[in-house]
């Protein structure tokens, strides 16, 4: 039972325990499968009336499970925009904080990798996918556990890069680390497939409901209203 109104340009965070329905909500938005009851609309048009290909062209996704293809680093990033120049690819990689590790690879941007990413770490593979999204410049972002396998220092840098990327774009962030979504315009708190709370970080803490206890479990020694 969901009822949410997301305005253009809003940053929306989706949080809750494992299995609460966060990923299902994203799958419905992307039309990986369709809603059985009710409807999801974009600018007043039900998503079922928008072709899947046309719908997904507007979305940029960074998932916990990365997807790469056999080919060079350059080709993998350029999937976000096949017509992009070398300089544009490098610029996107710099924004994603991937440029420095790419430069250290044997052949830099021309280093070949397999679908499993070869010797790249999970964090490095995610950085490549983030660079790809930087390059395709979508109108809507979906970040599903995007920084879950990246070290804390890199995560901070990526968060800053995404703050720039999210400006003027509607963004949906699915995360377990509540510290990364405190600045969201709207936080949807899910449990058992239902949105049980919604509001800003400050308002949800002041309500002292489920979100308050979820946040407190991660930061027990933090001033909750800070």
Question: Where are the language model's segments positioned?
Answer:
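ABC-type nucleotide-binding domain
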Residues: 1-226
């Amino acid at each position: 039972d969901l009822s949410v109104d997301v305005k253009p340009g809003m940053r929306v965070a989706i949080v809750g325990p494992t299995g609460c329905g966060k990923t299902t909500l994203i799958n419905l938005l992307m039309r990986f499968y369709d809603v059985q009851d009710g409807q999801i609309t974009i600018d007043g048009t039900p998503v079922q009336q928008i072709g899947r290909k046309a719908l997904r062209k507007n979305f940029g996704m960074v998932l916990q499970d990365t997807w790469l293809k056999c080919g060079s680093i350059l080709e993998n990033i350029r999937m976000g925009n096949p017509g992009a120049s070398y300089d544009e690819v490098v610029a996107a990689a710099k924004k994603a904080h991937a440029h420095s590790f790419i430069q250290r690879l044997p052949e830099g941007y021309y280093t070949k990798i397999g679908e499993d990413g070869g010797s790249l770490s999970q964090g490095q593979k995610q950085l490549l996918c983030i660079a790809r999204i930087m390059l395709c410049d979508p109108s809507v972002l979906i970040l599903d556990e995007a920084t879950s396998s990246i070290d804390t220092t890199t995560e901070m840098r990526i968060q800053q890069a995404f703050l720039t990327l999210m400006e003027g774009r509607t963004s949906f962030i699915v995360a377990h680390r509540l510290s990364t979504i405190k600045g969201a315009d709207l936080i949807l708190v899910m449990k058992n497939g239902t949105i049980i709370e919604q509001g800003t970080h400050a308002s949800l803490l002041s309500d002292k409901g489920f979100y308050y206890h979820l946040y407190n479990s991660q930061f027990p020694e933090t001033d909750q209203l800070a």
